Amino acid sequence: MASSLKIWGTLLALLCILCTLLVQSKEVSWREFMKQHYLSPSREFREYKCDVLMRENEALKDKSSHMFIYISWYKIEHICTSDNWMDRFRNAYVWVQNPLKVLKCHQENSKNSYTESRSFNYIEFHCSMDGYVDSIEDLKMVEPIGN
């Protein structure tokens, strides 16, 4: 009897550790996506500059081009939520219903500065197995945004 309790206790402890690792993996991919692509609406869209964004983010320093999206944190968090609100899309591609503001940065030949293009785009996001956005898959530009 005591040995079976030890086995069940060990299995329960291992299950708890596994669950913790799964939660942390979701947080890492979600956090990385937000760190690399998110522009907060707390500032005006025109205030964001590619040279500053690409220089400040360590993960983007060696990239020749990158894309940022200007959307509320709440909306990004709920992109992978189905109509049921209790369910999340898992390992699925989801197009947003309304166009979003996008800032694209392209490195120029001098490698010290970036050109910027701003536009409204429909965006297709990938929802991870955890049910949270982990990447941008496709864009359809609606119209450019003038400076």
UniProtKB/Swiss-Prot annotation:
Query: What compartments host this protein?
Result: Secreted
Entry-linked Pfam families: RnaseA
Q: Which UniProt keywords apply?
A: Secreted, Signal
Q: In which tissues is it expressed?
A: Epididymis.
The record's InterPro entries line, in alphabetical order, gives:
EDDM3A/EDDM3B (IPR042402), RNaseA-like_dom_sf (IPR036816), RNaseA_domain (IPR023412)
SUPFAM superfamilies, per the entry: RNase A-like (SSF54076)
Q: Kindly list the GO CC terms recorded for this protein.
A: extracellular region
Residues of the signal peptide? 1-25
Question: What does the UniProt function comment say about this protein?
Answer: Possible function in sperm maturation.
Name of the molecule in the record: Epididymal secretory protein E3-beta
Task: Tell me the organism's taxonomic lineage.
Answer: Eukaryota, Metazoa, Chordata, Craniata, Vertebrata
Q: Which gene encodes it?
A: EDDM3B
